[in-house]
């Protein structure tokens, strides 16, 4: 028996990257969270907040354990207030605004707790869902 095979060529003649559709993640309604000040996309649940005692390039910043709707750029070494770290800028996946950075690696043992954590500057986020004036912690 003799079989014939037809080879299908890639219909695209150019190697242009395909656009990926961005799906927005919504945190549970009623749960306190932080959102992008520019487009109001949810960024982090209040339960993921580790510390309010951080300094970003544009002022006060918060450290979070986990974030949503955030993209990450390439890591680079930077000397920060607490020493040398490998960090990657993070940005809002919806409006593409740079929000802060992700700690990829800490070179000093006392700073290892930051690895894999995220800094978001207050200049780029607002409180959303379930906040009241009396309980603002």
Swiss-Prot record:
Stretch list, region Disordered: 1-20
Pfam families cross-referenced by the UniProt entry: Yippee-Mis18 (PF03226)
Keyword Cell membrane on entry: no
Keyword Amino-acid biosynthesis belongs to the record: no
Example GO molecular function: metal ion binding
Positions of Zn(2+) binding: 36, 39, 92, 95
Transmembrane residue ranges: none
All residue ranges annotated as the Yippee domain in the record: 32-129
Keywords: Metal-binding, Zinc
Similarity comment: family membership: Belongs to the yippee family.
Protein's name according to its UniProt entry: Protein yippee-like F37A8.5
Species lineage: Eukaryota, Metazoa, Ecdysozoa, Nematoda, Chromadorea
């Amino acid at each position: 028996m003799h079989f014939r095979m037809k080879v299908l060529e890639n219909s695209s003649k150019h190697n242009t990257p395909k656009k990926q559709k961005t799906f927005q993640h919504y945190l549970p309604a009623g749960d306190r969270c932080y959102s992008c000040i520019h487009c109001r996309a949810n960024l982090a649940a209040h339960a993921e907040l580790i510390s309010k005692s951080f300094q970003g390039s544009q002022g006060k910043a918060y450290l979070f354990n986990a974030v949503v709707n955030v993209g990450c750029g390439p890591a680079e070494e930077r000397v920060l207030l607490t020493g040398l770290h490998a960090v990657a800028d993070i940005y809002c996946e919806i409006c593409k605004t740079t929000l802060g950075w992700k700690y990829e690696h800490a070179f000093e043992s006392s700073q290892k707790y930051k690895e894999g954590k995220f800094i978001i500057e207050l200049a780029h986020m607002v409180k959303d869902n379930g906040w009241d004036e009396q309980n603002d912690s």
